[in-house]
Amino acid sequence: MGGLFSRWRTKLSTVEVLESIDKEIQALEEFREKNQRLQKLRVGRLILYSSVLYLFTCLIVYLWYLPDEFTARLAMTLPFFAFPLIIWSIRTVIIFFFSKRTERNNEALDDLKSQRKKILEEVMEKETYKTAKLILERFDPDSKKAKECEPPSAGGAVTARPGQEIRQRTAAQRNLSPTPASPNQGPPPQVPVSPGPPKDSSAPGGPPERTVTPALSSNVLPRHLGSPATSVPGMGLHPPGPPLARPILPRERGALDRIVEYLVGDGPQNRYALICQQCFSHNGMALKEEFEYIAFRCAYCFFLNPARKTRPQAPRLPEFSFEKRQVVEGSSSVGPLPSGSVLSSDNQFNEESLEQDVLDNNTEQTDDKIPATEQTNQVIEKASDSEEPEEKQETENEEASVIETNSTVPGADSIPDPELNGESLTAE
């Protein structure tokens, strides 16, 4: 009879079996969490109540029931030493009891999970693709986790991360592959191509994106900033863009950053944005002092933006010669020389100048009748004309002193120079 009734019983489907297993797994997981909470609660209450009871009993015994004899006191304090050990043993028993329950629960949970895994493997082998996909998405925990951790779609909005300095623009991928045309349909309409320059399509706030013809844009990939440029048919390789002229300050700043900006006088409110003149892109923020005089190259379109103003330059200082200054100071510090020293130095200078004039002017004839005093005066005048303007006054003073000495000592200048006379005769 049992076999007959067993034939009439309907067999549970795979979905129903998985649902029952899933319910049992959830019940066991809830029981495990409840068991852990109950264990912590029981152990905590045991320690709390036993501690309060222990302190209260010690206080009562010490105030009212403490005997005077030493042996009686020792016998009275023995239970107080044994009480903490008893409480500790009770706590150990409670933890052991709950741990055993947790182990049994975990074993049952592992068995149910293994059964579910076997059933899912059978589903993947026996059921159709659509049914197996639905069952796996509903009961397989691995597929659930993978679905939850799936990254957002490329078409969704991309949120900017805090502290991101350079905006990365991603071009939208366009499917430009033509649809297969039916035989009844005519050829696709020809789109006239204008001979003018191609228009630039740009996103708001970003650089213009160059449009590419359908024949060339089928293999175009979006190029991120800071990465090596990708080769595009018909277009050359572009080097990676230059860095920003000035960094872009992050929007989210902490309290410490705001305090430092307030003390230093720096921050977004004290800076000016560097906007490219060609693509109107943001290239960082410059200080007020350097905004008018800074020139930068755009990090997106490589356009060189000149400075608005030229920085004023200070006038060039005259060159300073330390040796010349020493000569001037030495000449000003030297006082009038004595008559004897002036005479000797003047005679030596006259002799040297006369010899130089004779050697340079060999073709000229010299007059023997001219006295030696006049010749020395002429040489002194020539030498004074070639000296610097600062020493003119000093030479005049020396000439006056020489004239005075000549008047007092007639024999020194009236004696003719035999060498000079001989040279003049030979020249004649």
From Swiss-Prot:
Picking any one GO molecular function of the record gives: identical protein binding
Q: Name one GO biological process term.
A: positive regulation of endoplasmic reticulum tubular network organization
Coiled-coil residue spans: 16-43, 102-128
Q: Which GO terms describe its cellular component?
A: endoplasmic reticulum membrane; endoplasmic reticulum tubular network membrane
Zinc finger feature spans (C4-type): 276-301
Cellular compartment(s): Endoplasmic reticulum membrane
List lipidated residues, N-myristoyl glycine. Answer: 2
Q: How is this chain modified after translation?
A: Myristoylated; myristoylation is necessary for the endoplasmic reticulum (ER) three-way ER tubular junction formation, but is not required neither for membrane translocation, membrane topology formation, nor for the specific localization to ER membranes.
Question: In this chain, where does the modification Phosphothreonine occur?
Answer: 211, 213
From the UniProt entry, list the residue stretches annotated as the region Disordered.
143-248, 361-428
UniProt modified residues of type Phosphoserine: 114, 153, 177, 182, 194, 217, 227, 321, 353, 384, 414
- Family as reported in the entry's similarity comment: Belongs to the lunapark family.
Quaternary structure, from the entry: Homodimer; homodimerization requires the C4-type zinc finger motif and decreases during mitosis in a phosphorylation-dependent manner.
The free-text domain remark for this protein reads: The transmembrane domain 1 and 2 function as a signal-anchor and stop-transfer sequence, respectively, generating a double-spanning integral membrane protein with a N- and C-terminal cytoplasmic orientation. Transmembrane domain 1 and 2 are probably sufficient to mediate membrane translocation and topology formation in a N-myristoylation-independent manner. Transmembrane domain 2 is sufficient to block the protein secretion pathway. The two coiled-coil domains are necessary for its endoplasmic reticulum (ER) three-way tubular junction localization.
Q: What is this protein called?
A: Endoplasmic reticulum junction formation protein lunapark
Write down the species.
Pongo abelii
